[in-house]
Every structure is written in C-alpha cells, then in structure tokens.
Amino acid sequence: MEKIILLPEVIYKLNELINILYEKEYFGFIESSFKYVNDIYDFIHSLPTLHYKETANKKFGEYYCSYKANRNTTWYITFDKKGDRFIVQYITNNHTEEYPYFISKIQQ
C-alpha cells in the first residue's frame, strides 16, 4: 500500500491558503476555502493512481502532477517516489513565477 507523506512546509502552505482565499474574498464563505483546499488534499492522496511526469529541475522533487482546480488555476505538486512512498516536496500554481521551472527546461 502506497503512503503519501507531505513535508511540513506543504501542509503549512495549504493551511495558509484557506485564510488567504477567504481574506482576499476569492470565496465568500470560509467553508468554501476549506473545500477548495480539501480537494487539493484529495488530489494529493490520489497520486499513486495518477499519471505523473519528471520535473525539468529536481530542486523540489523528481516528479510532478498537475491539478486543475478551476479554469484559471492549475496546481503543481512536486514529489519524490521512494518505493511505495510518495514524499510531497512542494506545491505551487500557475499564478507564480516559479512554476515553469518544474515543467520546462528553463535555467535557474
């Protein structure tokens, strides 16, 4: 059975995302922010069943998977795979400057 391990930084970022989404009024109800982040957690926990690709740059993990949360936002989850363990190293989205470094051969 596969095991999903999230680094503390990833958990912190997702927990902070709940507050950011609500405070910046992306969602009118805090419950909607919780649901949005829970959907990301659900996706992460399904990593073993998903098609994933090698990252172009290994700084934050060997592999990545993309999760399309809505028509405007795609999340990129990077991880290492060690046997039956998936170790989630980092999460970012297409609204950041850093995400192309995971999916293309851009020099850092």
Question: Where are the model-predicted features located?
Answer:
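Enriched for short, Lys/Arg-rich terminal
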Residues: Y67-Q108
